[in-house]
């Protein structure tokens, strides 16, 4: 289960999560749909940022605690994002000219785990199809749309802060 949903495929894109399973998730979908509607009627652009699990540099010391049991962090496909990269994404979303209404996944370029993403998928989600070959510890959250639309490129990783990373 990924946020209460059966995974359809990996990497997960922003279109994968449109069936909310909690009131919080429903509120996010309603907000994005409202923004889309207002944008269509008014021409006002909207960029919604779907943030992964936010980590501050001082939070990274806890990361090795996650490695023994891959299922503990599978709820969001081992995704995370550095708070400094969140700030970068918000700045870019405000400054880069856009049109229409877009929702973008904002995550780190890697997972929070110390082993390859393909191994994590084989262990925890063996029946979920992969849309392409996974390389190393790459994120399983599709951040390419954020790169393409607002120029978002994650600059920070837990590996910069944790010995042995």
Describe the function of each predicted region:
Residues 23, 27-30:
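Active-site helix of classical SDR
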Residues 35-40:
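Catalytic Tyr-X3-Lys helix of short-chain dehydrogenase/reductase
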Residues 15-18:
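Conserved small/polar residues in nucleotide/adenosyl-binding loops
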Residues 1-6, 23, 54-58:
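Conserved catalytic-site region of short-chain dehydrogenase/reductase
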Residues 41-45, 56-66, 92-103:
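Glycine/proline-rich active-site loop of Rossmann-fold NAD(P)-dependent oxidoreductases
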Residues 8, 77, 136-138:
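Glycine/small-residue-rich pyrophosphate-binding loop that anchors the diphosphate of NDP-sugar donors
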Residues 26, 47-61, 70-92:
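Substrate-positioning beta->alpha
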Residues 84-165:
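C-terminal substrate-binding subdomain of Rossmann-fold SDR/epimerase-dehydratase oxidoreductases
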């Amino acid at each position: 289960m990924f946020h209460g949903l059966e995974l359809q495929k990996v990497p997960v894109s922003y279109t994968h999560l449109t069936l909310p399973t909690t009131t919080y998730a429903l509120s996010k979908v309603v907000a994005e749909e409202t923004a889309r509607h207002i944008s269509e009627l008014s021409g006002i652009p909207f960029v919604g940022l779907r943030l992964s699990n936010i980590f501050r540099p001082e939070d990274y010391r806890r990361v090795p605690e996650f490695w023994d049991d891959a299922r503990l962090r599978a709820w969001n496909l081992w995704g995370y994002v550095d708070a400094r990269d969140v700030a970068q994404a918000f700045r870019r979303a405000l400054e880069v000219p856009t049109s229409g209404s877009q929702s973008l996944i904002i995550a780190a370029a890697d997972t929070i785990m110390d082993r390859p993403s393909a191994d994590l998928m084989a262990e925890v989600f063996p029946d979920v199809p992969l849309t392409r070959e996974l390389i190393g510890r790459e994120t399983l959250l599709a951040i390419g749309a954020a790169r393409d639309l607002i120029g978002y490129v994650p600059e920070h990783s837990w590996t910069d802060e944790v010995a042995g990373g």
